[in-house]
Amino acid sequence: MITNEHIAQFIAQAHRYGDAKLMLCSSGNLSWRIGEEALISGTGSWVPTLGKEKVSICHIASGIPANGVKPSMESTFHLGILRERPDVNVVLHFQSEYATAVSCMKNKPANFNVTAEIPCHVGSEIPVIPYYRPGSPELAKAVVEAMQKHNSVLLTNHGQVVCGKDFDQVYERATFFEMACRIIVQSGGDYSVLTPAEIEDLEIYVLGKKTK
């Protein structure tokens, strides 16, 4: 059961992400699974200054709001990810400065593994989703499909989505994603990436991946 304490915690985390400059004004949205329901930032809300009146409580299975607050226009992919990924409890759609700049590049990076933090925390493969209208069924379908096996995606000319087990993991993924994109942009394209062997080494010794 969702309590006022849950709502207060959700709002505090929304403000934390805003303070980190992961989104501005009404850009971005956030969701948090609690049992069979989810807290979702409401449509038109400003996540950095989110208030209780703009927090929607939705049934994950049906998507129906339980408290009369309409959820974000992107709630379809939030709920879709939560349905498909029982290991995921938090989903964040954000538009940080450099990562969004990369999403608007004509020639987007095929590889974001500029530092060890990317394969270790963000994902060694980050799918790039074509542009679809925000809030559209096509965008929701593409995001949910991509995030069945990935924890981070780039949305062309739009932004980014990351998911994780809790607020801290999502914060970490979003922050390191932005860091990688800042390196890519500020390098002017003159940057190196980790080799597959170096990534595998990190996965074994940092993430504990078993060797074949």
Regions found by a protein language model. Name each.
Residues 1-212:
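Glycine-rich flexible loops
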